[in-house]
Amino acid sequence: GSAILGLILGLMLLAYPGYLAYRASRLPAISDITTDPSNPPRFDVLARLRPRGSSDYPGAAVARQQTAAYPDVAPLQLNVPIKVAYDTTLALVNKRKWHVVDARPPAAGRRDAVIEAVARTPIMGFRDDVVIRVTATREGARVDMRSASRYAWHDFGTNASRIRSLLEDLDDSVGATPVPRPEQKSQPPRGQPAK
């Protein structure tokens, strides 16, 4: 009886490292993922918390590996005003209990709204840094995201999964939210001058 229990416990202890080894063999050894490799969202406040030299996006070679491994990690275009996109994104970040270190809402004279936050990996609790950029477009708003492990050289797909999950939830949430319409000026009754 105790030998079988010991064997089961041993297998359970080896299961997670085995799973990571399997993931490592199938995924590229990268740990900085973004929806926009040509112009990735930048760490600003988080740059002070990251190891020296790790805040800049790693470049074209990593972008090629990312595109091959995670072709679905792409910007999200929403047909809602930037304020709705930003507020919904911030609500989802808070719901996930990520630690928000900076939140810059849309404002006159500011091109992008930005959220910077620290997320933790589910099992080991490692810190990963996240920056989300919301930009006004003619159609509504575009959301770009970057998720980077603070210390790891291989993220085992965690950052891509985090981006996918947030953007899918954002798309679903915005689709279920009524879009505020601009106020319309009331038309005067026929035969009366406009005020």
Mark where each language-model region is:
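Ser/Thr-rich, low-complexity intrinsically disordered terminal regions
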Residues: 1-6, 10, 16-195
